[in-house]
Amino acid sequence: MKVVFFGTPQFAVPSLERLLEHSDIDVVAVVTQPDKPRGRGKQLIPSPIKKVALDHQIPIWQPKRVKKNAQTLTKLRETNADAFAVVAYGQILSAEILQMPKLACINVHGSILPKYRGAAPIQWSIYHGETQTGITTMLMDEGMDTGAMLLKAYTPIQLLDNADKIATTLANQGADLLIETLLKLEQGELNPESQNSELATYAPLIQKEDYLINWTRHALQIHNQVRGFYPNCFTTFREQPLKILATAPLGEAYWEHLPSNIAQKIQPQWTTLSSLTSSPGEVVNLIKNLGPIVQTGEGLLLLLQVQLSGKRPQSGWDFVNGTRLSVGEKFLMV
């Protein structure tokens, strides 16, 4: 089977690698986003997918706008591919491109469709407190993740899982599902299922304001924001930005889902801690070898990992010691 692969970030790498390993699949070309300038020197950095393609000496095409690039369109046609496989490519494909392969354009999407259509399904599923997510393969159409569904695979989201961890799991799961989808497609063994648009939810691009922590929200909501938008959520501490990288919501609903060292240390103090009256963002206690406990609009939140501006990530307890943090200090929403 001749396949053209469209993809860009690390999430797409396992899918491309799995295709390259398969004896019945021939990856004839890779389409990825143009190299992006990074750092102070604005050095052009290739995408993770381009690096894999270079290692395997596969033709690489990097149009700024694939549907408007006549040269790329001609090359795509000339591949005479059986299928196009698309994994987090980052551009919308035109009807002209979708009709080129003999069998279909297959997309690997990081959610259980029709929930979380869009650019950031993993992040928003965690943000909204989902306890399960997965991968859907689908036949692509001109809409945003609206095509007929082919296969699905599920994975649980644990209380302390963040977007990076779930993305790694789903990237590998998606690679397996892509192979299965392509082989079954070739054998005519798939039964496409139309999406019910009434059940659709959306996962748009994340904006900078989505990263700002509002301490008046529920502790679990802030926790889900921190792990869903990892590693970008921030607050203000002593008039400087402070990234919050890992947290744990505290209380009876969470003990069994937290590591034993957290539950065992805090549970005996819980009656006292939970009766404190403090304002949102205020430090109410410092737990040795763990970190500060912060009051939220509803409930308490333990800060497990943070990052001061210009510094490396550090544990909550190292942050307490390094800044000589005191009970009563406040994190602000500025």
Curated annotation (Swiss-Prot):
Enzyme nomenclature, EC number: 2.1.2.9
Catalytic activity: L-methionyl-tRNA(fMet) + (6R)-10-formyltetrahydrofolate = N-formyl-L-methionyl-tRNA(fMet) + (6S)-5,6,7,8-tetrahydrofolate + H(+)
Organism: Gloeothece citriformis (strain PCC 7424) (Cyanothece sp. (strain PCC 7424))
Binding site for (6S)-5,6,7,8-tetrahydrofolate: S111, I112, L113, P114
Record keywords, A-Z: Protein biosynthesis, Transferase
One of the Pfam families matching this protein, by short name: Formyl_trans_C
Gene Ontology molecular-function annotations: methionyl-tRNA formyltransferase activity
GO CC annotation terms, alphabetical: cytosol
Entry's family note: Belongs to the Fmt family.
Underlying gene: fmt
Function in brief: Attaches a formyl group to the free amino group of methionyl-tRNA(fMet). The formyl group appears to play a dual role in the initiator identity of N-formylmethionyl-tRNA by promoting its recognition by IF2 and preventing the misappropriation of this tRNA by the elongation apparatus.
Protein name (database record): Methionyl-tRNA formyltransferase
